[in-house]
């Protein structure tokens, strides 16, 4: 039986035993992620174990899609898939071998960095983070790929300060609707706190703007240090979006009343748009506020795209984007969301200072209340 099962796996993949697992650094519905080291070369890697428990008909289709996409995407700001490894099926693993995706190791994820109050980003460093993030989105969108799970935990940063978009487990190729027939993609994607309003309203014919909404949430998070809209349900998330971005109406979002759930959900009425007003206590730079405002536009057709965002004055005004390597060199321990305390509302987090000085005596240490 073991031999039969083994034959449907990856006969040309190396054994994962060539790597020594060092620590678990991630856990999710997708499986587990480990920091590991190549036994011969010493190269550090990340091993993502593909969850096979519920697969009765061989290799999971979602993992096949992720592998295909990662083999297509080769860019400095996209995580690099090195190879695919396996463990052989045997009586010791109930005749079920495991598959591992092997990636270049990145020392941190953005959620882990933001959860650590000792990590201080200057304004110029925030500019560099967002510049690399948008560069990555520009590249994948040019290659007709949607990420569909933009959040701080899926943004990796190496010790040299290079940002990598990661976790393409929900990613897919996209295309323009053909012959007036809309696409029918699933809208059950994107972590709730980063999910754009069009998906919450049931839209299935969507594109790159869904990832740009997540980029806007992440950009605001660079100052608030915690997700800015932490809904408990889809209805609650829409209410939080309305409180920040204004009520969802056909006046601000043409044809939104044609969306499947527009009439079925109780949408908040009478709310004015106040993205800048609500965030200006945290985000002091006017260009930064303006870009966040353009990323968090309700109507996906009017939301700024990655190309225009990269040309925004935020990136072309003083202080200019600067390298992260110097700041990260003072933090020798890896920081990941999985290893950090939860970044939920109610937690007391020090407001992000964008002063160029990192002297604790001169850095603003005032505690802030949540945006919501």
Swiss-Prot record:
UniProt modified residues of type Phosphothreonine: 186, 350, 354, 362-363
Lineage: Eukaryota, Metazoa, Chordata, Craniata, Vertebrata
SUPFAM superfamilies: Protein kinase-like (PK-like) (SSF56112)
Alphabetized InterPro entries for the sequence: CDK, Kinase-like_dom_sf, Prot_kinase_dom, Protein_kinase_ATP_BS, Ser/Thr_kinase_AS
Induction and repression of expression: By replication stress, in chromatin. Probably degraded by the proteasome upon Thr-186 dephosphorylation.
Keywords on record: Acetylation, ATP-binding, Cytoplasm, DNA damage, DNA repair, Host-virus interaction, Kinase, Nucleotide-binding, Nucleus, Phosphoprotein, Serine/threonine-protein kinase, Transcription, Transcription regulation, Transferase, Ubl conjugation
UniProt name for this protein: Cyclin-dependent kinase 9
Pfam families from the UniProt entry: Pkinase
Record-listed E.C. numbers: 2.7.11.22, 2.7.11.23
Residue ranges, annotated region (T-loop): 166-191
Effect recorded for residue 48 to Q: Mimics acetylation; leading to impaired protein kinase activity
Effect of residue 225 to C: Found in patients with global developmental delay and epilepsy with history of choanal atresia; uncertain significance
Subcellular location: Nucleus; Cytoplasm; Nucleus, PML body
Residue ranges constituting the Protein kinase domain according to the UniProt record: 19-315
């Amino acid at each position: 039986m073991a031999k039969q099962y083994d034959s449907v796996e990856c006969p040309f993949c190396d054994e994962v035993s060539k790597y020594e697992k060092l620590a678990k650094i991630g856990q999710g519905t997708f499986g587990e992620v480990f920091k590991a080291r190549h036994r011969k070369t010493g190269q550090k890697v990340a091993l993502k174990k593909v969850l096979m428990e519920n697969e009765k008909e061989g290799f999971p289709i979602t993992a096949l899609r992720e592998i295909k996409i990662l083999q297509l995407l080769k860019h400095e700001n996209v995580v690099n898939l090195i190879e695919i490894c396996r463990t052989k099926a045997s009586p010791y693993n109930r005749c079920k071998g495991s598959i591992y995706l092997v990636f270049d190791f990145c020392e941190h994820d953005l959620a882990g960095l933001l959860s650590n109050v000792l990590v201080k980003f200057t304004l110029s460093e925030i500019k560099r983070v967002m510049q690399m993030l948008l560069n990555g989105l520009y590249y994948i969108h040019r290659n007709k790929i949607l990420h569909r799970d933009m959040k701080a935990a899926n943004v990796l940063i190496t010790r040299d300060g290079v940002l990598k978009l990661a976790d393409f487990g929900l990613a897919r190729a996209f295309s323009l609707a053909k012959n007036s027939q809309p696409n029918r993609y699933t809208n059950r994607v994107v972590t709730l706190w980063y999910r754009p309003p069009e998906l919450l309203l049931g839209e299935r014919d969507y594109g790159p703007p869904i990832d740009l909404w997540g980029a806007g949430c992440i950009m605001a998070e660079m100052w608030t240090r915690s997700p800015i809209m932490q809904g408990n349900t889809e209805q609650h998330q829409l209410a939080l979006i309305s409180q920040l971005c204004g009520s969802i109406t056909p006046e601000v979002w043409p044809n939104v009343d044609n969306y499947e759930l527009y009439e079925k959900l109780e949408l908040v009425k009478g709310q004015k748009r106040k993205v800048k007003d609500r965030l200006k206590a945290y985000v002091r730079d006017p260009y930064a506020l303006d870009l966040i405002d353009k990323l968090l536009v309700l109507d996906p057709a009017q939301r700024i795209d990655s190309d225009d965002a990269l040309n925004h004055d935020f990136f072309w005004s003083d202080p200019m984007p600067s390298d992260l390597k110097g700041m990260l060199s003072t933090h020798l321990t890896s920081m990941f969301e999985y290893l950090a305390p939860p970044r939920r509302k109610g937690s007391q987090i020090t407001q992000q200072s964008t002063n160029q000085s990192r002297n604790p005596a001169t850095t603003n240490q005032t505690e802030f209340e949540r945006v919501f």
